[in-house]
Curated annotation (Swiss-Prot):
Record HAMAP family: Kup
TM spans (from-to): 23-43, 57-77, 111-131, 148-168, 179-199, 217-237, 258-278, 287-307, 348-368, 377-397, 409-429, 431-451
Name under which the protein is recorded: Probable potassium transport system protein Kup
GO molecular function list: potassium ion transmembrane transporter activity; symporter activity
Similarity comment: family membership: Belongs to the HAK/KUP transporter (TC 2.A.72) family.
Naturally occurring in which organism (per UniProt): Bordetella pertussis (strain Tohama I / ATCC BAA-589 / NCTC 13251)
Cellular compartments per GO CC: plasma membrane
Reactions mediated catalytically: K(+)(in) + H(+)(in) = K(+)(out) + H(+)(out)
Localization of this protein: Cell inner membrane
InterPro entries linked: K+_transporter, K_trans_C, K_trans_N, Kup
Gene expressing this chain: kup
Job description of the protein: Transport of potassium into the cell. Likely operates as a K(+):H(+) symporter.
Hydrolase as UniProt keyword: no
Top-level taxonomic group: Bacteria
Pfam family, one: K_trans_C
Amino acid sequence: MTHTAAGAPRDAKTAIHAPSSRMALMLGALGVVYGDIGTSPLYTLRACLNTIDDLQPAHVLGVLSILFWLLMIVVSLKYVTLVLRADNRGEGGTLALLELAVRGREGRARWLLIVLGIFGAALFYGDSMITPAISVLSALEGISIVSHTLEPWVVPVALVVLVALFAIQSHGTGAVGKLFGPIMALWFATLAVLGGYQIWLTPEVLAALNPVWALRFIAEFPVMSFLLLGAVVLALTGAEALYADMGHFGRPAIRRAWFAMVLPALTLCYFGQGALLLRDPAAIRNPFFLMAPEWGLAALVGLATVATVVASQAVISGAFSVTRQAVQLGFWPRMQILHTSAVEKGQIYLPQVNALLLCAVLVLVLLFRNSENLAAAYGFAVTGTMLTTSVLAFAVLPRDSTGGKRVLWMVLLGALLVIDILLFGANIFKIHEGGWLPLLVGVVVFTLMMTWRRGRRLLADMQARDRQPLREFMTQLEAFPPARVQGTAIFMTMNAGNVPPALLHNLKHNKVLHDHVLFLSIRVADVPYVSEDERFEMHKISASSWQASINYGFKEDPDVPDALRQVAEAYPEIDLEPMRTSFYLSRQTVVAARRPAMARWRRALFAFMARNSTRSTRFFKIPPNRVVEMGMQVEL
């Protein structure tokens, strides 16, 4: 007998974020989605042109043209127009796209996509470390334009701002978050006004809108053009957030915000800086802040600092979200996940991730000291993630197309993939300048994620090899039962349909069986949310035992007591009164096998991660005073 929980399907995305109007959604997208790419003008053009010794108008116009057309091709075409189509039930991001890419695939192709997707997600952590450091530093560097005597204060003030930013994470950003949209709207308006005024003074800069300037620059300086791509890509930082945050605001709001406000403001700002450099090449020391009048510099530094805090908040929240997805999909050990809002379910806080990010960001600020030094490190993380997205999109978007439409998809995505390869290749040459940092972070996180996934898979395979069919076992056990005790025993199991080790240990040591036995398995679907009518499935195993499977999406937090309340309503014959219910869990200790399935260092790493993962009781919200843990050793 199978049962599915009753209830109307729930639109999870609407439940999480349902603003009352299109304008509210667009304003929210400005504050969350576009903070990173919106603060790129602080450092991008300076990083592009600072290495050219004798800056000429042709250099300025050529680089501006390349920058503008990359914005149009990579952001407007690739992300806003195409990649946003690859949604996993309304959700985006590397791991959501990975789940779509591997769906229905087996063998080597599936394994390669998983490896690529995990490495792309791992590189995102490098981005999450660099973005707060480079953004806040670049904003505060404006105080050296206000007064040279203030320059030594840039790093100390940046450290204070960053510590404060990470300190407030545990309290949530609900109240302050309502200001993010208006703050970024003011920021983009400021970019447009500053840039527009400079263009009005030097309208010749608009010639760079013609792609001929980009092609001419590439033809005349091919090597320089390729290497400059490593800096021009800084204008694209944050493009990945458009896709990752699709679940919060929806495709239409993100597209409207980009074309109506963000793209025009960025274009005006970059071309405004170019206009200033055409008149005064010496302004390359900080073209963004030198666009402003002296009387407005202090206010601009303050606004820029607040805008970079908003941008940093977006990537910190993104790191929390990616980690939760990785935990739910089995790529990361269980971690403590706290909700900071009773209304917004998407507002979460992971203490361990927050602490590690803070330490990493502070080290980066002290190590690199200024935004220019961090620029090389930034580009590698960004282009690596973008390349991953392109490959996964190549595996997803043409899938349901046939004939000429499929060929068109392949050609278009192939061309975009070539551009991403060029951008990534240009940043490989910057590994020695700082690109080693996100590469190192990516390799470390990738190794951790693959080790955890491999270890869990080996444990599951080991249990499957030693499996005993649950239905037959319970039928035989009830035919010759041990002593029965009152109440209900709930056995958590990884493999539904097989006898859980905790039951065998309980029978061996305690020699009793409860009046009611419920075998409970938690399943995470390859979709972000599961509707309430699909929350659980029930099968009757024997006269006094049942098998329950509770289903969650990869963006949901398991809540076993809440799910059991639904089971109790549907199955009143099972005694699930909390005070008469005991949970039996297995606690495994990894030891070396005679023929190890993992290298010694990987086995030690997996065992360390397992010991330090959040306990099952806390992760599944099970009352600890109702839990019996059965310790056992497993060989790897």
